[in-house]
């Protein structure tokens, strides 16, 4: 059980970085890899972070960074399509990476905020 305590401590000490890493980890459950146990681990870690968040603002930030990691890594195929004409469209790759994760991260942030409001005692 020593590794479990270390994992909980790591998640609690770096909540935003942990949420970003868990969001990137959850992408492994998508095609072509289908590693579904990693999705369970990612959502379990997200729930731990949300229940440990001291305020709704922190829960919103944790949800946002989870969504940023999930969508920025999960929508890599858009960046891959931009690489077909790299000299002309290459400048769009960082904007697409940050923009897709930044915008779609809000779709995970608001449910995380509501989860914080409705958590039990």
Residue ranges and their predicted role:
Residues 2-121:
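Membrane-embedded alpha-helical bundles of multi-pass enzymes
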């Amino acid at each position: 059980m020593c590794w479990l305590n270390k994992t909980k401590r790591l998640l609690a000490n770096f909540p935003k970085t942990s949420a970003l890493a868990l969001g990137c980890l959850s992408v492994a459950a998508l095609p072509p890899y289908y590693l579904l146990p990693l999705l369970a681990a990612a959502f379990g870690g997200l729930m731990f972070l949300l229940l440990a968040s001291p305020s709704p603002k922190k829960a919103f930030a944790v949800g946002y960074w989870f969504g940023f990691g999930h969508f920025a890594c999960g929508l890599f195929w858009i960046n891959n399509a931009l690489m077909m004409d790299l000299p002309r469209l290459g400048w769009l790759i960082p904007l697409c990476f940050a923009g897709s994760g930044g915008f779609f991260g809000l779709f995970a942030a608001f449910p995380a905020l509501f989860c914080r409001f409705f958590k039990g005692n």
